[in-house]
Design a protein with these regions (language model features):
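Accessory "access/gating" subregions that flank catalytic or transport cores
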Residues: 175-207
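Conserved active-site and cofactor/substrate-binding residues in soluble primary-metabolism enzymes
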Residues: 4, 8, 39, 43, ...
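Phosphate/pyrophosphate-binding loops at sites that engage ATP/ADP/AMP, CoA/4′-phosphopantetheine
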Residues: 158-178, 196-199
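Short coil/turn connectors at secondary-structure junctions
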Residues: 26-30, 55-60, 82-84, 92-94, ...
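Short beta-strand segments
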Residues: 60-66, 89-90, 183
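Condensing-enzyme catalytic core mediating Claisen C-C bond formation in acyl metabolism
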Residues: 74-162
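Short acidic, glycine/serine/threonine-rich loops at helix termini
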Residues: 2-6, 45-46, 71-77, 98-101, ...
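Conserved catalytic cysteine-centered active-site region
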Residues: 2-59, 65, 199-207
Length: 207
């Protein structure tokens, strides 16, 4: 989009704080949108942490907001929903500290996408137009393959976990973890994911 949605959030907070800090109190703050399905907020978090590491006297705010909408009666319908959360990133953290070691895994797959097509108006109407010579067709409901998407997610988690082990030098890092947080499109997805990793780490048959 030409206008980042982050500017709307900034404007609302700026207006709320105007009485205390004056009008346009955020005039020297930078804002940017990062959009990438479910992981956009994580990417924004990583970028903000890098910014704060390079500028320890500054802070960053990550606002994550998303909704999932599926066709009625589709297999994805019961996973739909929406939510939002905000993080304040600081070099002097009060609640949570994030180490500078992460595992990443990426692959170009086609398990989930929102189709967008352009069709020439003359192909539809048979008549020439003096403006906007194309018709854009877009659906807000995705085309997806649920089981394939599950497998892609599982494979990336394993690859990211392996990468984290290499980066951290920790043979079994999960042994020092008290809690695990997963993106959960539906109940028990996280348990299914980590059960396989736990089995592999302990020589169990996960086939």
């Amino acid at each position: 989009a030409a206008k980042p949605t982050a500017t709307y959030a900034m404007q609302m907070v700026e207006t709320a704080l105007a009485g205390e800090f004056g009008e346009r109190c955020f005039r020297n703050c930078d804002v940017v949108d990062m959009t990438f399905a479910c992981v956009g907020a994580v990417d924004a978090l990583h970028n903000s942490m890098d910014f704060v590491r390079a500028n320890p006297n500054k802070k960053a705010i990550v606002i994550a907001s998303d909704y999932a909408k599926y066709e009625l009666a589709s297999t994805g319908e019961y996973t739909q929903g929406g939510g939002s959360v905000a993080f304040l990133i600081s070099s002097d953290a009060k609640l949570l500290e994030i180490e500078n070691k992460i595992g990443v895994a990426t692959e170009s797959v086609f398990d989930f996408f929102k189709p967008r097509r352009e069709i020439g108006k003359s192909s539809v109407t048979g008549l020439p137009e003096t403006f906007a010579d194309k018709v854009e067709i877009f659906t807000d409901e995705p085309v997806f393959d649920g089981q394939y998407s599950n497998q892609c997610y599982q494979d990336r988690i394993k690859e990211a976990y392996t990468h984290y082990k290499e980066e951290s030098g920790n043979v079994k890092p999960y042994e020092n973890w008290r809690f695990l947080i997963f993106h959960l499109p539906y109940a028990f997805h996280g348990k299914r994911l980590f059960t396989e990793i736990f089995g592999i780490e302990n020589g169990m048959n996960t086939a």
